[in-house]
Amino acid sequence: MPLSTAGILSSSSAASNRSRNKARYRTKAVSSEVDESLFGDIKSPAQGQSDSPIVLLRDKHTLQKTLTALGLDRKPETIQLITRDMVRELIVPTEDPSGESLIISPEEFERIKWASHVLTREELEARDQAFKKEKEATMDAVMTRKKIMKQKEMVWNNNKKLSDLEEVAKERAQNLLQRANKLRMEQEEELKDMSKIILNAKCHAIRDAQILEKQQIQKELDTEEKRLDQMMEVERQKSIQRQEELERKRREERIRGRRQIVEQMEKNQEERSLLAEQREQEKEQMLEYMEQLQEEDLKDMERRQQQKLKMQAEIKRINDENQKQKAELLAQEKLADQMVMEFTKKKMAREAEFEAEQERIRREKEKEIARLRAMQEKAQDYQAEQDALRAKRNQEVADREWRRKEKENARKKMETEAELRKSRLEQVAFKEHALAVQVQRDRDEFERILRAQREQIEKERLEEEKKATGRLQHANELRRQVRENQQKEVQNRIATFEEGRRLKEEAQKRRERIDEIKRKKLEELRATGLPEKYCIEAERKANILPATSVN
């Protein structure tokens, strides 16, 4: 619609009044929720713009065309304003002289108008539902497109020919995946137990080999000890023989010396008489010499005896040292065996404690799961009972309210009928007094009362039907909720059954994978060259490992 001159004038007057009232403006609130686009673009204070724009529901181009069509852009239009004291000629401006007016488009005005509308709760819920449905539809479309693109990508990846580098990368990725799966499977309790069994078999094999090696070394040491004892005994016998030979030679020398002395004495016996003194002297010298020889012999015998004692002491010391070394070696071996036995006992005790702890944790988990399931089933049964009890209570409340209202209506009806009867009696008395005059009036009154009664009865019937419909809808809603709860419970049980079946299948597959890995480990153990008896013992222990229970 074209903009009228009166509209422009009224807008200018309103702007002038607002400018005059600016000084009397008081702040009502610190913050405001008014659309800022109503105030136009933010301008600097230097431009002299006020904060009271005039809103014209036309854009600049439409306004310019309108003014051009009216001819206002060529010749200014004047308006004569007559007041009580003067007459003025006012020029209608073609532009906003103050520069404070805001010109917005109809679309912007409609947007501001729509934004200022306060939505009700139903409208907000409807808008939220529409937004939620739109979002779900968008997400479904996105997921569908993603699935289609993923399928196309899988088909393209399966059909395309890989390059050498991609083949190497693919093979490396598969190897890494297999290694990761293998490492993940190694963390299973059965495989850990299998690794412990294999390690235990290796330890037993190493320990038996060490024991055999110790026995061999001990046997060699005993043989060497016997050989050294024999050598020392032979050396001792030789030393004794040499000592006896030396004693024999010395005795022979003494005997030969004595014989020579006797021969010399016999030879010089003839000269004794002549050389008595000389002989006596010689005899004395000879006796001294004999004594000296005897002393030397005694000293020599004592020295040889001391050497013999020293040699025996040395031999005893060597024997004692050998016995001491033997005792120390036996003590070390015994200590090593005790340490090995203590380590084995402690290890077995730790393993027993660990297995007992694992068994206790498993039993506690089973008890907790059973308790949670019992609580869940009890809560579901309790919720269903509460829903049924709540529905029954609501139904009883509704029935009591209906009976109360029925009694109230019956009481009112009886009161009304009593009043009617009383009124009728009065009317009959009045009719008897002035029957001719009041016949038509009584008939009209009777018809009015009868019509009111019928309307009241119809109204009560409609209200009763409405209440019955409401009760029926409420009962149907309760039954629907009970059915939904029962269906949810059935679905939960089906889901629980499916979950148990899936867990059982996964446990079976896991059991097969673990058995395959056990067989491979036993084959690798045999491939290491371990004796067959240890392999058989490890296989026997691996076959009696307990399987993981699935709840």
Swiss-Prot record:
Gene Ontology MF terms: AMP binding
**Top-rank lineage group of the source organism:** Eukaryota
Does the record bear Acetylation in its keywords?
Answer: no
User: According to its UniProt record, where is this protein located?
Assistant: Cytoplasm, Cytoskeleton, Cilium axoneme; Cytoplasm, Cytoskeleton, Flagellum axoneme; Cell projection, Cilium; Cell projection, Cilium, Flagellum
Please give the GO cellular component terms listed in this UniProt entry. Answer: 9+0 motile cilium; 9+2 motile cilium; axonemal B tubule inner sheath; axonemal microtubule; axoneme; cilium; extracellular region; nucleus
State which tissues express it: Expressed in respiratory cells and in sperm (at protein level). Expressed in nasopharyngeal epithelium and trachea.
The UniProt annotation puts the region (Disordered) at: 1-30, 461-489
Enumerate the UniProt keywords alphabetically: Cell projection, Ciliopathy, Cilium, Coiled coil, Cytoplasm, Cytoskeleton, Disease variant, Flagellum, Heterotaxy
Q: State the protein's name.
A: Cilia- and flagella-associated protein 45
| Primary localisation category | cytoplasm
What does the subunit comment say?
Microtubule inner protein component of sperm flagellar doublet microtubules. Interacts with AK8; dimerization with AK8 may create a cavity at the interface of the dimer that can accommodate AMP. Interacts with CFAP52. Interacts with ENKUR. Directly interacts with DNALI1. Interacts with DNAH11. Interacts with DNAI1.
Associated disorder, per UniProt?
Heterotaxy, visceral, 11, autosomal, with male infertility: A form of visceral heterotaxy, a complex disorder due to disruption of the normal left-right asymmetry of the thoracoabdominal organs. Visceral heterotaxy or situs ambiguus results in randomization of the placement of visceral organs, including the heart, lungs, liver, spleen, and stomach. The organs are oriented randomly with respect to the left-right axis and with respect to one another. It can be associated with a variety of congenital defects including cardiac malformations.
